[in-house]
Amino acid sequence: MNNLEQLERLEQSITLALYEIDANFSKCHRTVTTKILPIVEKYAKNCNTIWDSSKFWKQFFEASANVSLSGVEEPVPVESNPSDQDVMSNSTEADLQLHTKNEHLEKRHSFVGKSDFPDAAVQGDNTKNEDFVQSTPKKMDVSLEDISLDDAALTPIPARMQTPLRKPENNPHTGRSALLHRVLDTNWQVQVTPREPKNLQSQEVMDIDSSPFVSPSPISMKMDMPSLNDRNSSHALSLFAEFEHESYDSINPSGMSPPKTIQFSPHTMGVGSSQQANERSLSLQRKLETLNDSNDSFVKEEDSWEL
């Protein structure tokens, strides 16, 4: 009878512990649903608004620096593999089978009748048997610490009844923001990876020299002009002097002096050396002065002849 009483007390204490666990679970569920989840949802809404407003600046700085920030990305939906789905379905089926077996054993244990005990145990007190058969347990005055049980009384659980250990699933959090896991950190570390430089195609420059409405640039004019050496420059100056002398003789009427000419710049004639150009211009000016003097003297002689 001592063993029977101990089993009865143990079952009642177990049921009381289960009731207490159920009450604690309901309390935790009520706390999570009424207090924690609304705060988390409100925080998520505020974070979404902040993220939407900062997207423009993130893209602007990435484009200006030609980099990409990898720590502040939006979550990307993870594609599920068919093999993972098969493993999950097999594990759920095994859990359901184990749960049904445990329920069946509990029902058999709760509906234990008098026929399962020996005659010596049945001939005991009827009140004890009635208390044992009742479904609603009574609170015992004895606590769990006062009850002492031998290790042999506890039957070990068979291996086929134990829940198989699951392998840790390595779910890669691809595309998820790393900042969500470091909310309380003070030092932010964001990985920055440079992008590949874009190959800019060389744009064809419009040939402005070919257009009749656009004047050529002075650089192209200088490049097109042939470089004059000393012989060509002296030859050009001599030809210019002869042409000027002939033009004076043909244009000016008789008895009038030709106009005085200005000093020519050596740069307009394309002379390379400035010193040589100055010397040539001085010699040319002297020749012109002598011509003017001779012409004046000739005019004076004609006037004297007329008188």
From Swiss-Prot:
Residues 298-307 have a biased composition (Basic and acidic residues). Residues 250-284 have a biased composition (Polar residues). Signal peptide: none annotated. The keyword Nucleus applies. Disruption phenotype: Sensitive to thiabendazole and osmotic stress. Double knockout of mal3 and ask1 leads to cell shape defects, including 6% T-shaped cells. It is found in: Nucleus; Cytoplasm, Cytoskeleton, Spindle; Chromosome, Centromere, Kinetochore; Cytoplasm, Cytoskeleton. Its main location: nucleus. Component of the DASH complex that connects microtubules with kinetochores and couples microtubule depolymerisation to chromosome movement; it is involved in retrieving kinetochores to the spindle poles before their re-orientation on the spindle in early mitosis and allows microtubule depolymerization to pull chromosomes apart and resist detachment during anaphase. Pfam families: DASH_Ask1. Component of the DASH complex consisting of ask1, dad1, dad2, dad3, dad4, dam1, duo1, dad5, spc19 and spc34, with a stoichiometry of one copy of each subunit per complex. Multiple DASH complexes oligomerize to form a ring that encircles spindle microtubules and organizes the rod-like NDC80 complexes of the outer kinetochore. DASH complex oligomerization strengthens microtubule attachments. On cytoplasmic microtubules, DASH complexes appear to form patches instead of rings. Keywords: Cell cycle, Cell division, Centromere, Chromosome, Chromosome partition, Cytoplasm, Cytoskeleton, Kinetochore, Meiosis, Microtubule, Mitosis, Nucleus, Phosphoprotein. One of its GO terms (biological process) is protein transport along microtubule to mitotic spindle pole body. GO terms for cellular component: condensed chromosome, centromeric region; cytosol; DASH complex; kinetochore; mitotic spindle kinetochore microtubule; mitotic spindle polar microtubule; mitotic spindle pole body; nucleus. Residues 117-137, 250-307 are annotated as: Disordered. The modification Phosphothreonine is found at T136. Belongs to the DASH complex ASK1 family. The keyword Cell division applies. This is DASH complex subunit ask1.
